[in-house]
Swiss-Prot record:
Organism (species): Salmonella paratyphi B (strain ATCC BAA-1250 / SPB7)
Assembly mode: Heterotetramer of two alpha chains (FadJ) and two beta chains (FadI).
Source organism, top-level taxon: Bacteria
GO cellular component, one term: cytoplasm
Record CDD domains: crotonase-like
Region of interest called 3-hydroxyacyl-CoA dehydrogenase, as start-end residue ranges on this chain: 306-715
EC number(s) reported in the record: 4.2.1.17, 5.1.2.3, 1.1.1.35
Function, as annotated: Catalyzes the formation of a hydroxyacyl-CoA by addition of water on enoyl-CoA. Also exhibits 3-hydroxyacyl-CoA epimerase and 3-hydroxyacyl-CoA dehydrogenase activities.
Lineage of origin: Bacteria, Pseudomonadati, Pseudomonadota, Gammaproteobacteria, Enterobacterales
Name under which the protein is recorded: Fatty acid oxidation complex subunit alpha
HAMAP family for the chain: FadJ
């Protein structure tokens, strides 16, 4: 047996070499440049052992194969040439694995992503477990990159060009059965027999060649390929709005390899990787990745968390049902739901059933796993079953006396250590805790809708909240699969506070005569997933505008919205998607009809609907108000750091990830440019655009929010 720091070679008695991958001191395996020499030493031993029948690569980690290449390697590259060299080194190593003279099998359990899948693709066959943790994909596009170690060339030849383009352009991850159907793996087996199944496959002298499906064979021909690439380019441009250069390069590189051969394809891949690594988009996306990783490690406070064995939820509505699902099905914690009637409890239970049943239908989980997770959720119309709950989340109506009553009832019916967490989106946590016997155990935990999809939560301590309460709540959020940021107990907290002026300005432009679709298209072009008017429809016009008076009372006229317009829309029973009537027309099932704006909206608010502003002007007016408010939040310590502010905006409202978040974007523009732009807009549109003191100070001192890759605290 020969041991290296990350790889261990063991030649079995049946002459099959097993290479175990185990990066020391790390929970997950990642590929690093320094491992190349270690792998080559093992490959040399394999080539020299003429008695070997086959090779199996397998992870020694409990639940991952290889999660990807170490992204820090890219950050160390000073220029495109160095990044290109890094890619070529990876390509060469994979080529050496593929060139081994005996069958080489990748035995995959857990995450097999990025460079990990590229290594598996270099093997002659792949076999994986049927475990829910097993996923395969090439997510490099999400970092503004493309697979740089041969993935763009091997994957299309293995699964077909159409499937490969879909996987690489989206970064989607396939589960075991999906990977088998696509031809990405050759077999799916229980984890208990993974190694032996891989060994048996390695012993086969001749491995049968897989035939691509008819559709993929047609698309592989010159005519089919030309049509496919033309269509993919068009659809990709529509989706990315030209904001993600990696997608264009991915298409070019794959097409080059298929049209001109693998050698040209590998060369194009390496060059594109090097160039993309230096783009501001990739740098911003990688910064978001590292920031989110840091946030997930942040305990929230220095105190150790308290016990967290079970959770209670008050309210079985849309939010309560979603919170129950992430707590039980993501966090694995028993959940007890209390509602004033059984209808609410049944709604919450059905919410989880529907989500889990969808997973069963898609073969992501088994029916037995669905039943196991559902068994964690129970309900009642009183506080039976609440006495031992460690934390209770309130998800009732936005009514202060009602929430204060909930605090009193929880303190009366639950344990002395039970934490009360309010899912309020607008009410001050200090006011909710005003009459509490144990105010140190009251905290805000603001989820975003739909709970099962939105990754962010805001954790909001008030002045008396204890450090342990913060730590316990942050721990729960992480168990729920969320990315938590701790924010101050000020009106609107962080996300809603920066979102409100952005939406207000969109409504204001609507009253000036700008068309709904023009406003939305301008912000989508800027990089948001949906425009502000459509977002208001999705959230619910009644819900989305409810916070405006709260913010206006706290911060003054800059948060005022055209009240008559909002009132006219609400009085016409327009709530958005949820009741089928908003700014857009909706079908019976709540689906938009080609995003068709309801023309009656213009008459309702008394305008003609004729756009005069350019898309750039529309986007500038909305975005600059958001940025200015984000800078105020930094100054007032509403957020703890620029890092948290960027994560909150990207994960909470879809701020364009390729810009890195509002604070990285402001740093890229420069505080001087920010102040000048805001002053110009203030002269045109009024004092709501006046640059905040934080930006003026930073412009004078030539400071930035981020310093040397670290977070800057508010001053």
């Amino acid at each position: 047996m020969t041991t290296t720091s990350a790889f261990m070679l063991n030649v079995r008695l049946d002459n099959v070499a097993v290479v175990a991958i185990d990066v020391p001191g790390e929970k997950v395996n990642t590929l690093k440049a320094e491992f190349a020499a270690q792998v080559r030493a093992i490959l040399k031993q394999i080539r020299e052992n003429k008695a070997l029948q086959g090779v199996v690569f397998i992870s020694a980690k409990a639940d991952n194969f290889i999660a990807g290449a170490d992204i820090n390697m890219i950050g160390h590259c000073q220029n495109a040439q160095e990044a290109e060299t890094l890619a070529r080194q990876g390509q060469q190593l994979m080529a050496e694995i593929q060139a081994l003279p005996v069958p080489v099998i990748a035995a995959i359990h857990g995450a097999c992503l990025g460079g990990g899948l590229e290594m598996a693709l270099a093997c002659h066959r792949r076999i994986c477990t049927d475990d829910v943790k097993t996923v395969l994909g090439l997510p490099e596009v999400q970092l503004g990159l493309l697979p740089g170690s041969g993935g763009t060339q091997r994957l299309p030849r293995l699964v077909g060009v159409s499937t490969a383009l879909d996987m690489i352009l989206t970064g989607k991850q396939l589960r075991a059965r999906q990977a088998l159907k696509a031809g990405l793996v050759d077999d799916v087996v229980p984890q208990t027999i993974l190694l032996e199944a891989a060994v048996e496959l390695a012993k086969k002298e001749r491995l049968a060649q897989r035939t691509l499906p008819v559709r993929e064979r047609i698309l592989a021909g010159p005519l089919g390929r030309a049509l496919l690439f033309r269509l993919v380019r068009k659809k990709t441009a529509q989706k990315t709005q030209g904001n993600y250069p990696a997608t264009e390069r991915i298409i070019d590189v794959i097409e080059t390899g298929l049209a001109q051969g693998s050698s040209s394809g590998y060369d194009a891949e390496a060059r594109a990787f090097g160039e993309l690594a230096m783009t501001p988009q990739s740098q911003a996306l990688r910064a978001i990745f590292f920031a989110s990783t840091e946030v997930k490690k942040d305990p929230g406070s220095d105190a150790p968390p308290g016990p967290l064995n079970s959770v209670g939820i008050l309210g079985g509505g849309l939010m309560g049902g979603g919170i129950a699902w992430v707590t039980a099905c993501k966090g694995g914690l028993p959940v007890r739901i209390k509602d004033i009637n059984t209808q609410g409890i049944n709604h919450a239970l059905k919410y989880s059933w529907d989500l889990l049943e969808t997973k069963v239908r898609r073969r992501h989980i088994k029916a037995s796993e669905r039943d196991k997770q559902l068994a964690l959720i129970s309900g009642s119309t009183d506080y039976r079953g609440f006495s031992h709950r460690d934390l209770v989340i309130e998800a009732v109506f936005e009514d202060l006396p009602l929430k204060q009553q909930m605090v009193a009832e929880v303190e009366q019916n639950c344990a002395a250590h039970t934490i009360f967490a309010s899912n309020t989106s607008s009410l001050p946590i200090g006011d909710i805790a005003a009459n509490a016997a144990r105010p140190e155990q009251v905290i805000g935990l603001h989820f975003f809708s739909p709970v099962e999809k939105m990754p962010l939560v805001e954790v909001i301590p008030h002045a008396s909240t204890s450090a342990q309460t913060i730590a316990t709540t942050v721990k729960l959020a992480k168990k729920q699969g969320k990315t938590p940021i701790v924010v101050s107990d000020k009106a609107g907290f962080y996300v809603n506070r920066i979102l409100a002026p952005y939406i207000n300005e969109a409504i204001r432009m609507l009253t000036e005569g700008e068309r709904v679709e023009h406003i939305d298209a301008a912000l989508v072009k800027f990089g948001f997933p949906v425009g502000p008017i459509q977002l208001l429809d999705e959230v619910g016009i009644d819900t989305g505008t409810k916070i405006i008076p709260v913010l206006e009372a706290a911060y003054g006229e800059r948060f005022s919205a055209p009240a008559n317009v909002v009132a006219s829309i609400l009085n016409d029973d327009r709530k958005g998607r949820k009741n089928g009537r908003g700014f857009y027309l909706y079908g019976e099932k709540g689906r938009k009809s080609k995003k068709q704006v309801d023309p009656a909206i213009y008459k309702l608010i008394g305008v003609q609907g004729q756009s005069r502003l350019s898309a750039q002007q529309v986007a500038e007016r909305c975005v600059m108000l958001m940025l200015n408010e984000a800078a105020r939040c930094f100054d007032e310590k509403v957020i703890r750091s620029a890092r948290d502010g960027d994560i909150g905006a990207v994960f909470g409202i879809g701020f364009p990830p390729f810009l890195g978040g509002p604070f990285r974007y402001m740093d890229a523009l420069g505080p001087g440019e920010m102040v000048a732009t805001l002053q110009r807009l203030a002269a045109l549109y009024g004092p709501r655009y006046a640059p905040c003191e934080q930006l003026v100070r930073m412009a004078e001192r030539r400071e930035h929010f981020w310093t040397n890759g670290e977070t800057d605290q508010g001053n």
